[in-house]
Amino acid sequence: MKIAIFNLPHLSFNRGGEKWIIKVASYLSKKHGVKVITTDSNKKYDLNNLNFDYIVIKHKKKYGLLHDISEIKSYLKDIDVTYAFYVWFGTQIEILKYSKRVIFGHHSPLDKPIQKIYYSLLENIIARKIKDSYHHFLTEYRANIYRKKGFKKIFIIPNFIELNKYKPKEKSYDKFKIICPGVVNIEKGIDILVKVAENLRKYDDIEFYITGNKPIYENLPANVKYLGLLNEDEYIDIISDKNLMFLPTRQEAFPFSVLENLAVGNPIVVSNLPDVISAFGEFESVYYAKLNNVEDYINGILKYYQIWKNNKDKYEELSKKAREIASKFDSNIILPKIEEMFKKVYESS
């Protein structure tokens, strides 16, 4: 089977979608021919030593918000199944036009007003046959939204993690260290983080750490430290000795960062977005704070802080339960399901 995976950003952008592609393509390439195709948009650095073909095309715009990926045509000629991220305006028509079989991957909620307008036009007027394509969702919640729209060829397969790479370390009991991966812009909630951190400055033993691209705010509170853009090994090492993950995000489908932190035994305080709740379920190790509610985010943080400070055994139990949640998403369980999805689509016609 010959497979192509398309996404707009360069793989070096290194967010959840890019991580998903690299892991999936590496796994599938053991048995199948795999091409990954992206544009050079958001390229951070060159990538070497990949065990699949990586093709980078020039990022172009048609007009307005629409992207031009017409160059992709020549690379899809001999492909049996094309997997394309659904989020990019203007890309779906050419994917449908040049592909034999298509799976559209839904890795973003698409709930913004402009997205709702575009996809309503696309699905109901411009390209109605898109409902007859296969669609991959990360959560039952998001899949149900599309079932109500008339989509029937649906796969639900969650994100995954290489559990053996993420090992819990002995937790610190001198400082309560809170990791905030990717909380660098408004969508991820940096404004909320700043307000929360300022409110908690009276606690000398609470510290916040940000990883990822440079935050949009230059002057952060004294109890917030920016650690920079880390490679995978550095990132795992950093999160493993933290005590809590805090993610006040405003939009999320299935955050890899939550999965990674659960795997190293960190309890989580995250916004109560329906996709996230659907992804992980209700557990004592995860606190779903009311979206945009500074007070409730603080409530969640202080809940785990008090347990950490006053009841070490209970905190260790929560840490162990966090790891147990992550174990359900081990790549050894999920990656074969993704391969099976491709096989079913390949054999469908």
Model-derived features: positions:
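Aromatic "clamp/platform" in nucleotide-sugar-dependent glycosyltransferases that forms part
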Residues: 250
